[in-house]
């Protein structure tokens, strides 16, 4: 089990795709949450445009029944949208001999750790923490700045809605939802 985490625009999906592209396509199955409709409905796509065909699922529980028998690597993008339930699903896949790579944000726009992060650190064999370049000053960025009005803790968006920021340039949004 490998977890790739960090702020937005840190290269999480690019790293996930790199892992997926190392094996023959028939041995890899990518998954993405149905809520993520940004670039393509049926593919995991990086901000730079790299893509890999994906199975779209509504919940973590929908992943195991959709795994093809030839699969030796499950690549799961936007893992933070699946919540803590994904941890148990991934552990089950690993027990069945399937390697798993999960790409996920580590914190929300308020700088709060997503609930599953502590569990991931406990169960992952490898945790790769990535950073980006601050959109304001060019220093190392570990935070995600929301640029548009916030309606919920988890909101899908790209460069029109978010940008990476360093600790000094990041400002928490006015009010955090529960």
Model-derived features: positions:
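Conserved P-loop
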Residues: 1-66, 108-119, 132, 156-177
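Catalytic-core regions built around general acid/base machinery
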Residues: 19, 88-96, 116-123
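Short acidic/histidine-rich motifs immediately flanking catalytic phosphotransfer sites
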Residues: 69-73, 79
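Structural recognition of the conserved hydrophobic beta-strand(s) that form the central parallel beta-sheet
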Residues: 75, 99-106
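Conserved ATPase-coupling elements of RecA-like P-loop NTPase cores
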Residues: 78-93, 108-114
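Short recognition patches in nucleic-acid-associated and regulatory proteins
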Residues: 130-155
